[in-house]
Amino acid sequence: MSNWLLVVYRDWLVHIVHRLKLELLKQRYLHIDETHVQVLKEPGRKNTSDSYMWVYCSIRDAVNPIRYFEYQPGRSGKYPEAFLREYEGYIHTDAYSGYNAVSGVKRCLCYTHLRRAFVDALPKDIHNSEASKPAEAILRLNQLFNIESELETLPPDQKKKERLIREKPLLEAFWSWAEKSAIGELPKSKLSKAFHYALNNREGFWNYLEDGNCSISNSLAENCIRPFVIGRKNWLFSGSPKGAEASAGIYTLVETAKANGLAPMKYIKYILSDMPGSAFLEHPEYLDDYLPWNPLVKEFCR
């Protein structure tokens, strides 16, 4: 079965996956996340080494949503830098420093991660006096999320205006409070780390205010990569780098099909039934006939 999948991916599916990457890089807003994966037979590496599966996603309201998975042997910033070398736009990420290697983009950092840092800083006894600061941080950030829920259905331009009126003052107050509250905290405590997470990445947390299409959370990328994480618990590892590449490509097709309202099995069956008769190698534009938003594909694969 695995050898058959490798051949099918190499001969047919890979061409659609590459086409989806080109389409994704035309989009101005992306969500990015990564998770570890074990890959055997990597040159010069032990089988127990951690490799990574990266996911690059369209925003929620994208006309043509794409979920692109890419296997790489590491987590270094050189991998997103290479993927996004010609890209200009906004990327939603966590505060991992590896993304600093990506030039020509604006990073929108994830408030869900920031709130989680303060939740982790809460003592087990919430009545403990040490709970007051993390609890206040959580309440302040919850105000932001509550407003975002109210603005969810607004068009981008109007959402931007409302954010500047309603959210910007809250952010200014939060960072002013954080600067004062961080003073005197034990350097290695969870609360001190949460404050530093906020204060050291302030610019990235503010960037979403520039454009109403941007989000305050990178949860979309986490949700996109979750099917891979769940699958990993069952199949445990990839048998080779080629297998990991094929796995990334097939996850790309399956999750992109789902994002476009298609039945993944029908979609892949449609590709493999029709593509062998296509002259796509001589005419690469024919690959557009197999993209998940093509009207004929939507007709047969829902």
Q: Which residues make up each language-model segment?
A:
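Catalytic center-proximal scaffold of phosphoryl-transfer enzymes
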Residues: M1-R302
